[in-house]
Amino acid sequence: MKRFLTSLVALAVTATAASVVHAADKLTLQLQWVTQAQFAGYYVALDKGYYKEEGLDVTIKPGGPDIAPPQVLAGGGADLMLNWMPSALAARERGVPLVNIAQPFKSSGLQLTCRKETGITKPEDFRGKTIGVWFYGNEYPFLSWMSQLGIPTDGGSDGVTILKQGFNVDPILQKQADCISTMTYNEYWQVIDAGISPDDLVVFKYQDQGVATLEDGIYVLENRLKDAAFQDQMVRFCLLYTSDAADDSLGV
């Protein structure tokens, strides 16, 4: 009987150890913005079980206009995050040791979308206008652009008035702003869907203006990369975006 109990305990210990070895590694991903097509690949990977196949148990946290991903990461609310490089660099300057471990987006989709009736035909026409701009680090490309143009950003007839833009396109629909920030794959089409014709809009792509920056990089805290187990988790997570998993999101 004693031998049986000893064997049973040994078996239980072995089973427990095996379950620990094969338990999925929990990861929390903080998105840059609210749930939208921009992040389709991450949701497709979750829905189709690609993370699970890599031994990862991933939780995706949506962002928003009042959520700063670097703060979430620094506070331990996420293991990795999506962020634009200007925001990440600004956070690093403030003491948050962010490191870019992958760059899924290779070009910028950021643009300013303006009502044609405002008379804006070129960037120099922004003077005296109200511009909707996203904050929490996303404002830096715009501020850099205005600096290059020599246009003040503190209002007045010779400068631009900055409107802190939320997650919708209401400022241009309600004529609270002459231009708003949009992404080529999202907010621009929200404006169109709201009934404004493309012929009634003027669009300025940051890429065309030479002021674009890298967007949607995957960032982690530098000190966590000292952990070999965490490194392995990040490799498994990021490799999904060089595989067929990334292609599946194209049909979404």
Regions found by a protein language model. Give the residues of each.
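N-terminal low-complexity segments that are often proline-rich with Ser/Thr-Pro
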Residues: 250-252
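Bacterial N-terminal signal peptides that target proteins for export
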Residues: 1-8
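Sec/Tat signal peptide C-region and signal peptidase I cleavage site
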Residues: 19-23
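Hydrophobic core
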Residues: 13-17
